[in-house]
């Protein structure tokens, strides 16, 4: 198995993000995929989100930002919740009617216990096996896909480095698989 890859093909990304909504309906899994793709959070941070982190129960509305302490780095991160993420959260919230202390991505049998990383991996792998041609897809692909498309949309390198907490843009390019894409273009465009 190779290095985890982002989902580069836009149609495959569309199919991947909607699999648990349209093909095999399961709102928890759908929300996991959509939130992962739209926040660039590591799976450990996604799985530790509680409903009170994304929904203000006093004001009865979704929050505009997530404030988390990253599990891996211990750093504080303040992340805007975009409309796609809010829409997925809304659908799941309406189905679940959760308590503020429940985990957003909880076990089916106990909403006060987070989904395991291995179960999250199985959810992502099942989705990818039906929707993408890329074999090296894992939970980390959600984060890499966010970065890959941010790069494609022209997000400044320094900002991407900041989002991923990398010390150099070279590391960020390698992390997102951009370095290989650029190298491939050189070979594909030189036809002697």
Annotate each predicted stretch with a short phrase.
Residues 9, 15, 77, 177-192:
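DNA/chromatin major-groove-contacting recognition/catalytic segments
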Residues 54-56, 156-176, 181:
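Short, polar N-cap/turn motifs at the start of nucleic acid-interacting alpha helices
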Residues 35-48, 153-155, 166:
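A short, glycine-centered helix-capping/turn motif at helix boundaries
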Residues 5, 71-90, 102-125:
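C-terminal catalytic core of Y-nucleophile DNA break-rejoin enzymes
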């Amino acid at each position: 198995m190779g290095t985890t890859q982002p989902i580069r093909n836009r149609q495959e990304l569309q199919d991947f993000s909607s699999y648990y909504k349209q093909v095999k309906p399961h709102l928890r899994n759908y929300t996991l995929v959509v939130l992962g793709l739209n926040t660039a959070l590591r799976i450990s941070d996604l799985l530790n989100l509680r409903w009170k982190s994304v929904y203000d129960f006093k004001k009865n509305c979704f929050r505009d930002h997530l404030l988390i302490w990253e599990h891996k780095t211990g750093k504080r991160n303040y992340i805007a919740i975009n409309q796609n993420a809010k829409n997925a959260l809304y659908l799941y919230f309406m189905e679940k009617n959760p308590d503020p202390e429940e985990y957003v991505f909880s076990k089916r049998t106990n909403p006060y216990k987070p989904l395991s990383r291995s179960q999250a991996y199985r959810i992502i792998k099942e989705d990818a096996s039906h929707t993408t041609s890329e074999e090296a897809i894992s939970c980390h692909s959600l984060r890499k896909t966010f970065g890959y498309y941010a790069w494609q949309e022209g997000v400044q390198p320094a900002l991407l480095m900041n989002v991923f907490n990398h010390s150099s843009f070279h590391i960020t390019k390698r992390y997102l698989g951009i370095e290989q894409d650029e190298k491939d273009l050189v070979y594909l465009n030189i036809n002697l």
